[in-house]
Amino acid sequence: MGLIKKQIEFLDKFTKGKWTLNEKTGLVDIEGDFDCSRNKIERNYYGGVKALSDFKEVKFGVVTGNFYCVHNTIKSLKGSPQEVGGNFNCSYNNLTSLEGAPQRVGGNFNCYHNKITSIKGAPQDIGGDFFCSNNNLTSLEGSPQRVKRFFGCSNNNLTSLVGGPQEVDDFSCGGNPLASLVGAPQVVSGYFSCTNTKLTSLEGAPLEWKGNYSDFYRNPISEDTINLVWKTMRKNKIDYRTALISLKGEIPAKDWKKMSSAL
């Protein structure tokens, strides 16, 4: 089945490179980039920009470069590429789900500033960063288990990190109502940040951290206490409860009162 006029115009307008239609599958492959972000759309007579709400029923197959559809009103990723060689960015839309997202992304995957409630459907093979911050996530179930670079899930409604990746370079989970780090990645080779949460327990904190910078400010427990307990856990390869008991008398009374409830 061929493409209709509006679909051809859509592809011609936003493709930087060459697009081809696979007559057997009905999928459009692109050798190059595709960018239908709002800033790429022509302004109307009054200076406004009409955002896209969908992909004009075009179904994409493989995009060798980047695929961008940022700052629109897209509600579904149905029809988006199955594979992207570069970056995939669908941020600042009205998405509530990642169903239909590409399953392989060679670069970064960005879906921040949407209304996404579940990460299920997210790509499992990612070559770069994974950003899902500023959504309505209550769970990380469905996340890729290994992210080669940065994983950011800040500013959601997460009360647990269960289901998230277990191996990352950098990790940020700030701005969530987390009381502990249960489910956090166990191998972090770079930056680790957990700021502005309800953290009163380091249960689940990674025991293998090769980085040189971390953030724990604006939590119920002081940053100094958190770093002391975490360092003790890592140095001695012991769990949170054991580390806490070993530090009794060294932790300020205010922090001890909040943390000792785990004992």
Q: Which positions does each model-derived feature cover?
A:
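N-terminal capping/linker segments that flank leucine-rich repeat
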Residues: 1-59, 226-263
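LRR N-terminal entry segment and analogous cap-like coil->beta motifs
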Residues: 13-90, 106-107, 111, 127-128, ...
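Leucine-rich repeat domain C-terminal region
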Residues: 196, 207-241
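Canonical leucine-rich repeat
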Residues: 44-45, 52-58, 77, 84, ...
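An internal, amphipathic alpha-helical element
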Residues: 131, 173, 191-205, 216-219
